[in-house]
Amino acid sequence: MKFFALFIYRPVATILLSVAITLCGILGFRMLPVAPLPQVDFPVIMVSASLPGASPETMASSVATPLERSLGRIAGVSEMTSSSSLGSTRIILQFDFDRDINGAARDVQAAINAAQSLLPSGMPSRPTYRKANPSDAPIMILTLTSDTYSQGELYDFASTQLAPTISQIDGVGDVDVGGSSLPAVRVGLNPQALFNQGVSLDDVRTAVSNANVRKPQGALEDGTHRWQIQTNDELKTAAEYQPLIIHYNNGGAVRLGDVATVTDSVQDVRNAGMTNAKPAILLMIRKLPEANIIQTVDSIRAKLPELQETIPAAIDLQIAQDRSPTIRASLEEVEQTLIISVALVILVVFLFLRSGRATIIPAVSVPVSLIGTFAAMYLCGFSLNNLSLMALTIATGFVVDDAIVVLENIARHLEAGMKPLQAALQGTREVGFTVLSMSLSLVAVFLPLLLMGGLPGRLLREFTVTLSVAIGISLLVSLTLTPMMCGWMLKASKPREQKRLRGFGRMLVALQQGYGKSLKWVLNHTRLVGVVLLGTIALNIWLYISIPKTFFPEQDTGVLMGGIQADQSISFQAMRGKLQDFMKIIRDDPAVDNVTGFTGGSRVNSGMMFITLKPRDERSETAQQIIDRLRVKLAKEPGANLFLMAVQDIRVGGRQSNASYQYTLLSDDLAALREWEPKIRKKLATLPELADVNSDQQDNGAEMNLVYDRDTMARLGIDVQAANSLLNNAFGQRQISTIYQPMNQYKVVMEVDPRYTQDISALEKMFVINNEGKAIPLSYFAKWQPANAPLSVNHQGLSAASTISFNLPTGKSLSDASAAIDRAMTQLGVPSTVRGSFAGTAQVFQETMNSQVILIIAAIATVYIVLGILYESYVHPLTILSTLPSAGVGALLALELFNAPFSLIALIGIMLLIGIVKKNAIMMVDFALEAQRHGNLTPQEAIFQACLLRFRPIMMTTLAALFGALPLVLSGGDGSELRHPLGITIVGGLVMSQLLTLYTTPVVYLFFDRLRLRFSRKPKQTVTE
């Protein structure tokens, strides 16, 4: 009583306290960062190593394995995967959430140093690492195009000037430059001319290397002067290499230009990048795992004018893709939804109270509670994201509940003729415990979520804490500001209604009277209601088991990623043509705004595409509908497949794949893995629950297998090293010398001119100079035949691995796909030597599925404990919790009706319903107990009176919560796929709960009261005590 009086009779102090809360909230709001979702990125580090010309199997055994053994000893590594292809190895380390990425980076560097002695000596550089996840979609893609400069020159500008500067921007984790390679002098050898001149490929390599040398020459001095010695020992351009003498034949000089075509070209000609059908260099920017995407993008944009000034005017620097516009648009949609929710909730209060003065009170208390929450969010290090803003939207219905309960009870006393200040004090005292019980039991629902580990726990933490803080501030405001405003603003007389609202008032009275009559009938037929309650419990279980489930709603971020997978024996020229063909098909789609892509590098038969869709208000289809439409057109392209997927804000795992979900096969027997992977992939491709099934197992590449006749080689005076050196010189794009320039270093690359390597007959033109100086054709001591060879070798941990990726067809859920895969694996009879498990997002979904039921039970148990403590009773909490089954049925039925799978967002809705619907029962039980103790009423009379007296506030609180959630259901635009499941769950649960709990709660109350009397030996003595 004294606590409430302190604020009611000191209005200035109460107002200033509320103003202080509001000002702190406004300040916190201005300083809060913006993000699509809470920070849930796993710390990921990528280790890269190269050995030019080495086969994938050689890279896996001699480079990947030693590094994996050393890196695997690092503490906190949750997953380690590697992929080895021609000349390169990439190892992805994913760490536990609580692992500091900078400390992990130091451990990674130490592990690389420890493995250095076990790595091949021919590696051109030490392995390097980056603090970025290569499987993440870039947050921004920049393109360089020019009609004047070559692709190599553009790549040089991008990698030498732009990429290092961008990498220094806060939040940037990696800048990957693609579409070409650094400039280089290329020496294209003519095998026939070499043979005619008696010059070996090693002779050319040695001559070029010796002609371009950068060594210190020293200085000359006399008594008074000093001269630095400088020579023309370096060759910089193709024109300078052309006249280089490499050999003498019969006294005549053989120059490099006589046996080769020397050009200013690029280091690797098997690279191509494009943007909207125009050749381009791509700068793909990824953020650090802990960085804020909006802040990072804004920092990059602010740097762009400076970057443009560092490159020539003839080079066009453009933003081809930017993830931030859709994120900003999504947050604007949520903010609008929040404002609409507040307006609807205030409208509900106005309709029920039919008083402008009374409506002003929640119209003030609700914003104070919501705005004050921003200060706590800032102190907790949170961000303004879809989930935290949705928490505030839902909180609108909660925070007004507290004000409604207090306001309605005070208004009831005023209508009875009590003076305003007395009514405020008396009314607040009566419902103070009710409001406290409602708020504490609601916060108790979220305690299990706060203790939840892994990605789901991290994802829901901001939502949970934000909502709990809003409820806490609302509790304070409803017991301080609300009664003070009631006492000083409301009048003792019954408010005069406007004519247009009298109809609503009469309808409410009629509803209350009708409810009273139906409740009497129900209380006389309690067994029927008991059967209905048991039926809802059984229906809950059946619906939960049968409803499709997924991890997180599929988002439409306005960005698609595409992975091209062509025949494993395809040439680079043909692959570049496939890239152009696919880009044309996609560019012609009316919903597409921009297309960029690249191919080449160590994997000739693959490519990547990044597609920016038009804004949501300029297209009628969702991203998935656009993918479905394009899938039909892309399937007509022969010789290659393009797999599209919508970029998601949450992506788990470091392995790059061509689809959203992964199923990984592991085995210590590589032969068994290669035997069973095609069988499993073909089986999964037939399942209707899966789409775009593909695999990263590339073991069917074309190979030319050379078999040396060692006896013949010995007789001819040729060793294996000379033969291997010949092949590397001819076909390996061998880097034979380095050109030093002020800003960068460039290579001299030697190989047989591509004009002479169009078919297998090129091998017949190769020869080796033996120890007697004679030219011996390769065909004299070697035989060759076509064979198959892997294009890549993948590991997970230290086991061989193949990952099958898949998307979900329209209308299918991740639970459908998971169950179908499990059935298929059982039907195939896969041996125990091959182990299958879900990876990435699918793995997190499996883990979440196993904990969902436990989480719901834990929430109910927590609420029971809190209510038991508050009521000092084992029974009354059960009465209150009896409202939950009907809410569960309503939520699950609503999801089924809207074809929405049960996701993590829907789980939040279920948890919220546990907190919302029990409020009705709390108000009934509180007043019934009060009537029994002080009104000398029987339990049936008490609960009947409580139901009628609390009918108006129950309807108000339920409709307030319903209207607060309704904008989530009806909202469109960016991010609506996240809001819809939450709104559908809450609205469906509230509607069903409101229809049933008004009748089931009093029946359950009477049932437990009779049960208590039956088992109580001395009820009278207990009452006396």
UniProtKB/Swiss-Prot annotation:
InterPro entries: AcrB_DN_DC_subdom (IPR027463), Acrflvin-R (IPR001036), Multidrug-R_MdtC (IPR023931). It is found in: Cell inner membrane. It is a multi-pass membrane protein. Pfam families: ACR_tran. One of its GO terms (molecular function) is xenobiotic transmembrane transporter activity. The keyword Transmembrane helix applies. Induction: The mdtABC operon is transcriptionally activated by BaeR. The chain crosses the membrane at residues 3-23, 333-353, 360-380, 387-407, 431-451, 469-489, 528-548, 853-873, 875-895, 897-917, 953-973, 984-1004. One of its GO terms (cellular component) is plasma membrane. The keyword Repeat does not apply. Keywords: Cell inner membrane, Cell membrane, Membrane, Transmembrane, Transmembrane helix, Transport. Part of a tripartite efflux system composed of MdtA, MdtB and MdtC. MdtC forms a heteromultimer with MdtB. The MdtABC tripartite complex confers resistance against novobiocin and deoxycholate. Belongs to the resistance-nodulation-cell division (RND) (TC 2.A.6) family. MdtC subfamily. This is Multidrug resistance protein MdtC. The lineage of its organism: Bacteria, Pseudomonadati, Pseudomonadota, Gammaproteobacteria, Enterobacterales.
